Each structure stands twice: as C-alpha cells, then as structure tokens.
C-alpha cells in the first residue's frame, strides 16, 4: 500500500458559524447523537486517548484500502487542536493551517503549522447539503456534487446517506475565468473529508484528487439540524501502528517510545517476552562531511533557462499545452554540436524564467538518465560529459515538463546528455578553482559523507592506526572502514551510525538493552561491561532467578543480567562406581575411535533494517512498504536461536551430589579410615591387636622364618614354661624365636643359677638354658643364611631382568611415538571437523559480500544513489537494492534454519550416545564406535562433544552353520532361550556359542525352550494384502510406476560441477593413515607381550622372612603396684558408701544395739479412722 508522506490537519464539523475565518456562533451540544463517543480532550503532546473509539475515522490511502489487519503508516493522528461545534446552520469560514480561524481547543493545543484539515461528520441518517471551498495561491476552488451528469445541475454536497448517484466536480476561478473538472462519483455514505496542505483531498479515507498547495478551507452546511454536530481538529503527521477493522480505525499506537517503536517494528500491539533487535532513533537531517584529493580545479557552469506562456484570452484552454515555449542552454551553439565540459569541475543550474503563469510550473525530470540534472552537483564523477538541446546518439534524455496544478502534465522539451564513466570531471555544488584539497569532516557524530568520491553514512573518528599505503580502506563487502588524510597522514575510521541493539522485553516493558557501545538512549542508569557487549538496565543485580534466558545468560524481572548455570538435578539414589577387569580374547583387538557431534551453534541475530539500509532514513521508509518482511526474517532467526538455547539448556545438566561422590578421596565430611578392616594373615586371624592391647603391652616387630613363629605361638598358648617344649624345626634344625620376654629370661636365669650352685649334682638343671640358647642361635644363623641365598638370587635375576626391561621400554617408546602420530592424525581430522563447524562464519561472510552487489541498480551505495538521482528515481533504484538484499537475507535465513535443524538432530543423537554409550554399555553393534562396545568417554569440544569409544574389533572369524532349534523324533521342538546364542555342529558334536564372541561350549537343557511341535506355519497371502498386515510395507516397484505416470515432461537442467556448493568432509587419507598406525601399534603390542613374558620368567621366588609382632608382658612388680592401687581405691569407695547417710551400714548397726539395750517393744502408734466419701 502506497503511504503518502504528508501530515494532516483534522477538522470534525457539526454545527457552527464563522465570519472572516472566525467562528461567530456555536454551542456545545451535549444532547447530540454520539457526542460523548466522538468528542475527547487531547492529551499532552497531541496524542489521542487510548480509549477513543475512532468512529468514522479512516486510514488514509492513495490506492486500495485495508479491510482488516495491522498496518504501520504515517497518518494525521498527532493533533494540534480539537474542538466541537453544533447548530441549525453553520459555516466555518476559512480555517487556516496555521490555526487561524480555529475554536476553543479541548485539551492540548499547539500553534505549529498543521498539515491537514479533516472533517468528521456526525449527522443523523437524513440528508444534509453543503459545499467546500479551498483558498489557493492562484484563486478559489469549489468542490461540489450533483445528481445530474451535466455540470449545470444543482451544485451541492450531500452529507449523510445519499440516495441516487452524485457526480463531483471542481470549479477553479482564476481572475474572471472559471473552469470545471470532473473528479469522481460521491460515495453513498459520506462520513469524513480530509484536505492536506499539499492539496490532497480524501473522502472516507480514499484520495479523490489533488489540487496543489492549499492555504485555507471553508466548510459550509446549509441544512443542519439541532442534533447535528462536528469536531474540528488540526493535526500533523505521525508514525503510528494502526489496527484496521472493516476499513475503520479500531485503535492506534504512536511509535514514539522505545517499547512502542518495538511494537511498530514487530507489527504487534503486544510484544511477547524476549530479545529484539532495534536501532536508536536517528535524526533525519545529518551534517555533511566531504574529503577530496588535492587537485587543480577549473570550473564551468551549465545553465538551463526555461520559459513558457500558457494559453490566454477568450475561448482559450488555459490548462492545455502552453502557447509558447523558450528553452535555452547557456553557451550552447547548435551548429557546433553538444556543449561539452572541458574543465575538472562543473556545476549545473536550472533557471525558471517564466512568470505570472498562475497554477502552472515546470521542472526537469531524470528521464532515462542514471542521474538527475540537479543531483550531479553532489560530486558525481564522469570521464566526459556533454549537454545539448538536440538529440545525441547514444545519450540519454531529461524531459522538461510543464504541469497545471499538478494534474495535467506536458513535455515542452528535453535536455540530452552524453557521458562516459571516469573520474576526470566532477560535479560540485559551488565553483572551485586553483590547487586545493577540501576536507570538512564532522567527528564523533553521525554524518553523511563523500570521501574520495565514496558516499555513505557513518561516524568518523580519529584512529591510532598507521598505514603506509592506501588512502581508503574497505571490508570484503565493500563498506568503507577508514581513510587517510593525504595532506597530514592522519587515519580516520568509519563505523555505522547506529549499531543495532538488543532490547529485553518482559511484561510489555523494556527492562534491559545489550549495546555495542557504552552509550544508551533508552533511559537506563546502570551500564555494565561484559566480555562481548555492554548491558544497560535499572536492575539491582542481586537476583538469582532469570525470567528470560538466552545462550549462557539470563535476565531477571528487574532487568538484571546473570549467568545461567546448567540445571542442577538430584536423584534419590546414586549408583556406585564399579570397576572390573575385562578379559579380551586373542582373536580380538581393542580400538579407540573418535567421534565428533555438534550440539550447538552460535546464535545469530540480523538487524534487517541495518543490513538492508545501513541507516539511510529514506531507505528505511521504503522498507516499511514490505510490511512484515523484516519481521519474518528476524523472528525466524530469533525464535530458532531461543529454541536452540532452550534445547541445549535442557540437555546439559549436572548432579552436584553425584559429582562429589565420584571423587573417591572425599565422601563429604566423613573419615572412613576407622571402618576399613585390617588385612588378614593366615586363617581367620587378624594381623594386629586391639587399641587396648597396644596400650597395655610393648610391641616389638621382628622377622621370622616361614611359619616358625606362628606355630610356636599356637603351641605355647602364652605360657612361658612351654617355651622349650614348643621348639620348632626348620630344615631339620631346632629353632626358637629370637625374642624372649622377662618371664622367660627369669626362668632360664634360674635354671642357669641352679645348675651352677651345687656343681655336678645340679648341672642337669642348666640343660634347658643351653638348649634354648642354642635353638635361638640356630634361628639367627638360619635367618642369615636365608638372607644370603636371597641376595644371590636377586643379583642373578636382576641382571637378567635389566636387559628385558630395557628392551621393553624401547618398545614402549616406539609405541608412544606411533600413538603420538596417530593422535596427530586424529587432530588433523578434528581440524577438518572444525572447518565444517566454521561454515557459519563462511555463511556470514557470504551474506556481507552480497552488500557489494548492486542488484541491477546504478550503485551498491544507497547514499550515492540519492546523491545522483531525484527522490522518485532514486527510490526506484533503492527498491532494487532492498529486493536483492532481502532475497540474500532470506537465503541466509534458510541456510541458518537448515543448520539449526541439522544441529538439533545431531544434538539428539549426542544425547542418545551419552545415555547409551557413556552411562551404559551399548548392545547395538556400530552405534558406539564401529565395533562391539566396551565403554566410552565424552569430552567437551567447540560447539559439540567428542566421544572416545573403546570397542572390540574382530581379527579372526569362525565360520559355522547355525540352526534355530532342534526337532526330536519329529514331534518335540526346542529353540534357544537366549537370542544372542547360536547352535552349530562341529564335527560329530553340537556346540553353543555367543554371537558376540566365539566361546563354544556343550549345550545344556537350560539353553533351550520346548515349543509345541516342529511344524513351521506360514500364512499364504498376495502382495496386495501384505500392507494390510504390515502397514509400513511399501511396494517400491509399484510406487515408482505410479510416480512415473504422474511426472510431467521435463528437461534435465544443465548443472555444472561449479554450481554444487556443499562442504565435503574427506577423511580417506587420514583414516588410511590411522589404520596403518593401528597395525604398527598392534605389532608393537605383540612384541611387548613377548618381552613381558620374558620379564615374568625372571620373577624371584624368595624365601620370605615373616614379619612377626611380639608383645612383651610387664614384670611382676608392675602388676603388684597396679593391684595395690586398685585395693586402695576400692576400700575408699566402700568406706564412703557404708559410713554416710541414714541408711548407711554403721548407722543401721548402731540403731540396732540401742534398741536391744532399752526395750524390745516397738513404739505404739494410735490409729485414727478416716471415712472418705
């Protein structure tokens, strides 16, 4: 829908009377029909209240009308004054757009020049009559209608419901001459007239005709009733979002605030919670920055004079082709040919010589030239350029057009131009001469620039960079990034004026903004710097719960931004971590296979308006005509990114409790060393004694021979007198343990003294002493012998083992080298995976490179187009750029959405592999690596996960002939119970083996399940009936045959290989290298196994000396002291217990003695009866 870029003044009229532009009489009609619904007080700033019903207010359009929907448009809805009038007969007189002639304004009022006068008619259904007069600079124009096809009919305007057909005309009076022009048929019901200051006339929202500039309007109703009233409003144009219902305005939103601008951009009255792209409001009028190279200037003026005279006199058609035309090009000589510019600079100038032509005017249009006559002065460059009033072969024509009241147009001549591309001649706005360079730069502000003939819009800043070569610096997409002042050598950078921001919307309010610069125009007070952007809000940054999440951060209800951690999940029970040794058969090999799965991609949000228009205001206005094109593109990217973020957040979780328990070194705050059992020695006895025994006894640790000490202790049972009787024999030699306690020493000392005391009579008493001494010496001697033998064995075995160890470690070194090379190959493969992951960046580069394409426009720079062409012709060229760039954006969005779909499928596959490969052992062959799965480890990788699958790969196969079961005597059937078992025959014997690993064994009855019989029953059906049993079955041949009948005739397109643009991941060479390295590693492993066997053959079988712990009891006097102390303590306790209190032993005894001495009678007690009721 074409949007007219004008502002309007609204005039709703009911009953009033004015004289000379002033209302002379009117009254407020509170009883008028619909008064309360149509009259309101204008809010501050000229805004219409949100609860206004907009009865009989229509959306203005130059073409077709919108029936239902939401439209963003410039409409006359910013009111400068509003008043209501009523009466039997009213005439407004002339009401001017500057406010002259207006009544008492209701609510807000302003004296600014309004753009529209609008009449809203609140009459009853009966017909009213009136006229409308327009005052223009060339005379008075009357708009009227008649039910006669002839102009001479009854001239008036019927208001209300019209019966019959009425035809409308415009009478124009210039001087003494009056002419009429037919403008159209009047609608059956008239509810609104709108007249703009530029002469556009609307009825019920539709433009009927154009007059040219209008100064004032006089609205006259001659047959009004007392119940009729009107409202008069003066209004200006405003950017609004309009909800249209049945061609009438239902409600509006002014696009004047941050949230309202966002609503207008989204074409929605309610914006869902989320993140949205936007750009700060930019001023329409921008300063101009110009930089040129030092050149020698010579200047020429190209001046075009246009003069004409309309037809005049009696019987002449004053609005027909002019009677006389005189067009002159200064310094042009028709005999010498075209006027060519032979200087370095020139300036074009259009001079209108005509005068007193009334509503006539003339102008020079662009025609089929790629530039306008006046716009070549905006530093447009040529190699050569020539002008002529005669046709130039190979040139273009600029028509000179005269128009009457902008309604009738006549071509009165043409200016012909011939040019060639180059930079030798430049059009300039002002003449310059001599050697000079021009530099007028506005720094640190948004500016329109022309730098070394490159036009655009941006912010120019002084840069610290230093480049020796070049004077302009561009990106791969052709955008100007910076330039050098050739006279001073200073480098300047150029950045976009308004980098797009991301606004955070929650509950219909903007609570935060993500900015590319540390500057906010959204009214936020707190700005924090984050690694990749600035974030502005009014939040307190002390919240913990995010209401919106995006990627790895979230936003709270007050606008505070926080980091979003993975979801913390907790389970009631945690499985213990169990490890076990796996036995691998010799005909299998172990392989670790690497697999990469992408689970996420970097979210991309493209600001459509910035990408297409790069901040050009006029381009942004044209872009709005594409309605929801940008909204669709941005919504697709934004919603896909949010869905991606939600899926990743749902996938990545952690259990803090499980993470803690997985660390075996800590189990919370508990020290588990007290519950760890001691290691047992022989039998069920435990090595070590209790803590009390360690306190009461002194412990001595020695080394013993074999089981001598254990057998000795078992024999003596702790009795010292059994020491010699329990002597042990080691290799036929009697031995006793080398440690003797004090009791044994006392016993043998007494034996020795007794043998010496009486000489020969008691010498036999010392025999036990001598035997014990000799046995203990034998114990020591044998220990020394065992140590010497062990030393010889160790010396021989160590020398033999060293050679094998050196060879083994040499092999290990070779294996590590080959493993390193294999891992290098894996790294190469991962680099190629990274290239696939980086294709998103390639897509962005391709998207930005499309900005260099002009899409059949004269330039890829929007500002350059507007500098060279008139507005209408420039709009046509920019429209091509908009269409092309939107198409490029759509291709990019399609590619991005396809990538999102692929990543989502990959993420789901990664989730399955984590559950099946990492958390458990997969039974699916080839799912967790190409082999039989053992276990898998997962590691994080850029934008994905890397799985290291440990699998078994078979190296040898056993071919067998398997059966599904057995049939005994033709009656009894048996089938295998487990589906992973196979029954086969080997020679004359039947065996069962696992299908996973060849482990033949003799079958048992537990392996079989008996079935009813040996019969195998089949159901005989036709092919057409198969799909009734198996719905998923598809007859491929039949389907292809049916498709072949339906295919139309076609021609195979000629697609060359260069048109196939798809990333191919070629890992063939790397896989072959990995296979070769794997074979070399397998050979090295076998060699290492041989060396390990050699090392095992050198194991030393030593005669171990046992570690013996002997507890030595304390001497007798220690026990005596302990007994004395215990007796004393017990005596004192008994004394205290028996001698204190009335019930003590001695007190009871004394009372008994006294009773015997005094009397044997018990004391008498009186008994008194007590009756209890």
Curated annotation (Swiss-Prot):
It is found in: Virion membrane; Host endoplasmic reticulum-Golgi intermediate compartment membrane. Its main location: virion. GO terms for biological process: endocytosis involved in viral entry into host cell; fusion of virus membrane with host endosome membrane; fusion of virus membrane with host plasma membrane; receptor-mediated virion attachment to host cell. The chain crosses the membrane at residues 1116-1135. Changing residue 441 to A: In strain: Isolate LRI 281. Residues 1136-1173 are intravirion. Keywords: Coiled coil, Glycoprotein, Host membrane, Host-virus interaction, Membrane, Signal, Transmembrane, Transmembrane helix, Viral attachment to host cell, Viral envelope protein, Virion, Virulence, Virus entry into host cell. Residues 16-1115 are virion surface. Changing residue 223 to N: In strain: Isolate A162. PROSITE patterns: COV_S2_HR1 (PS51923), COV_S2_HR2 (PS51924). Disulfide bonds: none annotated. Changing residue 937 to L: In strain: Isolate A162. Residues 537-1173 are annotated as: S2. SUPFAM superfamilies: Coronavirus S2 glycoprotein. HAMAP family: ALPHA_CORONA_SPIKE (MF_04200). Homotrimer. During virus morphogenesis, found in a complex with M and HE proteins. Interacts with host ANPEP. S1 region attaches the virion to the cell membrane by interacting with host ANPEP/aminopeptidase N, initiating the infection. Binding to the receptor probably induces conformational changes in the S glycoprotein unmasking the fusion peptide of S2 region and activating membranes fusion. S2 region belongs to the class I viral fusion protein. Under the current model, the protein has at least 3 conformational states: pre-fusion native state, pre-hairpin intermediate state, and post-fusion hairpin state. The KxHxx motif seems to function as an ER retrieval signal. This is Spike glycoprotein. It comes from Human coronavirus 229E (HCoV-229E).
